[in-house]
Amino acid sequence: MIKKNKLIKFLLGFTTLASSTMSMSKNTEEIEWQSVYNARQAFYETNIGKLPDDIMKAPHLFAVWPGGGFYVIPADKIKKGLWVYSTFGLTNSDMPATITPTNTETEYNQQGRVISTTTTLQKKKPIIQSSTKAGYGYEVLLIAKEDAEWPLRFMQWVGNLILINDVDLLSRVEKNNGLTVEAIPVGDGENDTINVLIAKAQKPLPIGMKLPNGNMQFLVATVITDEEMQWSIANGRDALLKKLMDSNTTQISDRDRQSILK
């Protein structure tokens, strides 16, 4: 179980970039980058839903993750009425990240939109990349029944955890048969938090694919109750995942649902 990391700070403003800005000029490395992007986009649109025109980007991650961001996808290919919140670019050919931001300052307007961001960039020791993995080797999904802001707060927390704090979620999930995280802040209130179980995607969800630069797996974060959190500590994350999959909850997040243990 990961406790809430107080070193992770949230920047509340997001900005959007048109998808066309993701394209690059065509030298050898950039051709590979674009081929990975195109293959991943095709997989998402075949198995989840059409990607929006705009990608959400956290200002402090601009330079660290220039070709990545977060998508809010109407998940019609999974089930109408569902929304998939997803990282998009952890499996890019220029990942893992080799720099980290420090002394970030972001200015917002009255509507909470970003006006400007300044940061100092420092090189960091790169993560040893597996030859079989595409970038970090995974993308993170949260599936919900609503188009809301709180899942984006969670996605930003995930971005900070992976890109800045260098936490290898995939390795932890594989080592522990899943990963529970408690009290992740997803709103302005002190008690506006969620607990999640992070596990590999289970069928009938798409599990992953082989991209031109290696394997991509999907990790899915599912909101769980306090009771389920404590039960998983005693009985195992894999046991909780099985109970979720055997129930109507599966890997879909609903902050208002009752515990499956009742």
Question: At which residue positions do the language-model features occur?
Answer:
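Bacterial N-terminal signal peptides that target proteins for export
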Residues: I2-L11
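Short linear motifs embedded in intrinsically disordered, proline/glycine-rich low-complexity segments
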Residues: L11, S23-K262
